[in-house]
Amino acid sequence: MKLKLNVLTIVLLPVHLLITIYSALIFIPWYFLTNAKKKNAMAKRIKAKPTSDKPGSPYRSVTHFDSLAVIDIPGADTLDKLFDHAVAKFGKKDSLGTREILSEENEMQPNGKVFKKLILGNYKWINYLEVNCRVNNFGSGLTALGLKPKNTIAIFCETRAEWMIAAQTCFKYNFPLVTLYATLGKEAVVHGLNESEASYLITSVELLESKLKAALLDINCVKHIIYVDNKTINRAEYPEGLEIHSMQSVEELGSKPENSSIPPSRPTPSDMAIVMYTSGSTGRPKGVMMHHSNLIAGMTGQCERIPGLGPKDTYIGYLPLAHVLELTAEISCFTYGCRIGYSSPLTLSDQSSKIKKGSKGDCTVLKPTLMAAVPEIMDRIYKNVMSKVQEMNYIQKTLFKIGYDYKLEQIKKGYDAPLCNLILFKKVKALLGGNVRMMLSGGAPLSPQTHRFMNVCFCCPIGQGYGLTESCGAGTVTEVTDYTTGRVGAPLICCEIKLKDWQEGGYTVHDKPNPRGEIVIGGQNISMGYFKNEEKTAEDYSVDENGQRWFCTGDIGEFHPDGCLQIIDRKKDLVKLQAGEYVSLGKVEAALKNCPLIDNICAFAKSDQSYVISFVVPNQKKLTLLAQQKGVEGSWVDICNNPAMEAEILKEIREAANAMKLERFEIPIKVRLSPEPWTPETGLVTDAFKLKRKELKNHYLKDIERMYGGK
């Protein structure tokens, strides 16, 4: 072994020498050509500061300190005006793109399941003028069907171009749009449609057949269903009195002269634009009421943090458009002339589950420059790439590590490593098309480990944001020059953020070295409250003496000296154990989620017990290999139910917990392995892959009793 190391040291000596020479020759011209000094100064500067010396005062961005921004494009104070501005400016430029489905094949998997595989063609684009024509026709058609201004219309549909066309129609014709996640279960969909009293519903044939058909008898108000696909359905299978139309037929109706001649009833800034139903991570979905002015303000803040946003950019849309992050990102891209190519998590990359082997995924074909991702997706990319690295031979692995560590060191200094990008990371970067210049992360905290990996291997900054549905997605976003990790950036120019003492959790604005407390966001981007839920609105929202709205987030934050915010806890995730210790379940999960053997984890604790337990979705490939090494045989379910495999997972949990310096009482001491992954379709996680703790608790109730010594 010693001889091997000595030989390796000799072999790698030229590599280290090359890096030293490269650094000496390239650094000085690169430093001046890329304006690295200015970028470093930008990264280190104060980005936000409190409005007064009083503890608990709101923090504001230093670039918009005297007043908060409420509008981006002069005169465009409603969403329809943003749309008109974009159409007038970018008329014949490509706008919305969809890939052609060339063929579909059923493929038998080793476990006996049949997966549908797709062979897809190139993207087909419609330009801004064509989008405008479809919006006008669809709006006139809905009006001809009897939909009145300020009457709600719901959309329960997958992310696609028709979703955006329908949304822009509703904004222009002043139809408040009720949005529902396509993965919601029957009970949640029925609740949202009945509570909103929507009489018109936009959906897809697949969702109509698989989810809505069985729920129609429980839905009170829906009289018209519009499906977006170019397919046919058997109307005889649906209740009498329910009118079903294709989107194409509604557009054709609207194009008739007697209908198209009627101008739309335009909205005002104080009109309702959206009632956005949440994913229900903490219970029944709530409808969040957003006025046009709320969304305009929020997007004003978000766009300011994306430098150079414009017609040269291509955005890949695959996250749920019912999620505020995706919706505001796409509207912003449309406004600034960026192409939007539509995708899905199942077709995103060449390795995605619906892409036939040998075919190209959407990123490879589209080559986006901008994309948004939730941490769960970035964690998967990180684990997949690092798994490939582990399969390399010793020299390849060592070379990768040298290059990775070298670039990481440069990034921490605010520099880059172009040679490493070209030689080492080009193939990794190609997984997302090769052209991504910035990624937006939101929906949950991104682990520092994954954040650093994305910076290094994908050669682009990560704009880590913090916002909520209730704040129209706007709160904070890290600047592209800020390469620190574990933080979510300074307040956007549209809002201010203050911290409020939470005595029970031990967080106060007087804490040293930095103030800590519950995060409260204020500004015009704060939504108007919860639909038909005045009690919850009064609990979470407030209005100050100046008429400004504030929202209490329930998240715990810490402000750093440069004005950047760090999310450190969540009130609802805190459990007091029997002996009096407080455990933050989210903190435990974040510390353990990047374990190679773990794909997902949920920590659980009860106040009448003295220890933490966990539910884990193991990595099937790695755990199966480990089972073979340990002589454990059987199916995947058998492996997950094997006590020896549970012990191996617990061993890895302990090692990771110690490395992350978790307290003894925070470390799970029992585990239940789940052979089935947690997906939005199972109802155990949201579309942003946040854990649904209540549903997980109910799902594993018997296991909880067993692990806590019950029957």
From Swiss-Prot:
Induction: Expression is decreased by polyunsaturated fatty acid (PUFA). The keyword GTP-binding does not apply. Both triacsin C and rosiglitazone inhibit arachidonoyl-CoA ligase activity. It holds the Pfam family AMP-binding. Signal peptide: none annotated. Keywords: ATP-binding, Cell membrane, Endoplasmic reticulum, Fatty acid metabolism, Ligase, Lipid metabolism, Magnesium, Membrane, Microsome, Mitochondrion, Mitochondrion outer membrane, Nucleotide-binding, Peroxisome, Phosphoprotein, Transmembrane, Transmembrane helix. InterPro entries: AMP-bd_C_sf (IPR045851), AMP-binding_CS (IPR020845), AMP-dep_synth/lig_dom (IPR000873), ANL_N_sf (IPR042099). It comes from the Eukaryota. The chain crosses the membrane at residues 8-28. Its cofactor is Mg(2+). GO terms for molecular function: arachidonate-CoA ligase activity; ATP binding; long-chain fatty acid-CoA ligase activity; very long-chain fatty acid-CoA ligase activity. It is found in: Mitochondrion outer membrane; Peroxisome membrane; Microsome membrane; Endoplasmic reticulum membrane. GO terms for biological process: dendritic spine development; embryonic process involved in female pregnancy; fatty acid metabolic process; fatty acid transport; lipid metabolic process; long-chain fatty acid metabolic process; long-chain fatty-acyl-CoA biosynthetic process; long-chain fatty-acyl-CoA metabolic process. GO terms for cellular component: cytoplasm; endoplasmic reticulum; endoplasmic reticulum membrane; lipid droplet; mitochondria-associated endoplasmic reticulum membrane contact site; mitochondrial membrane; mitochondrial outer membrane; mitochondrion. It is a single-pass type III membrane protein. Its main location: mitochondrion. Residues 29-711 are cytoplasmic. The modification Phosphoserine is found at residue 447. Belongs to the ATP-dependent AMP-binding enzyme family. 5 rat isozymes encoded by different genes have been described. ACSL6 corresponds to isozyme 2 (ACS2). Catalyzes the conversion of long-chain fatty acids to their active form acyl-CoA for both synthesis of cellular lipids, and degradation via beta-oxidation. Preferentially activates arachidonate and eicosapentaenoate as substrates. Preferentially activates 8,9-EET > 14,15-EET > 5,6-EET > 11,12-EET. Modulates glucose-stimulated insulin secretion by regulating the levels of unesterified EETs. Modulates prostaglandin E2 secretion. This is Long-chain-fatty-acid--CoA ligase 4. It comes from Rattus norvegicus (Rat).
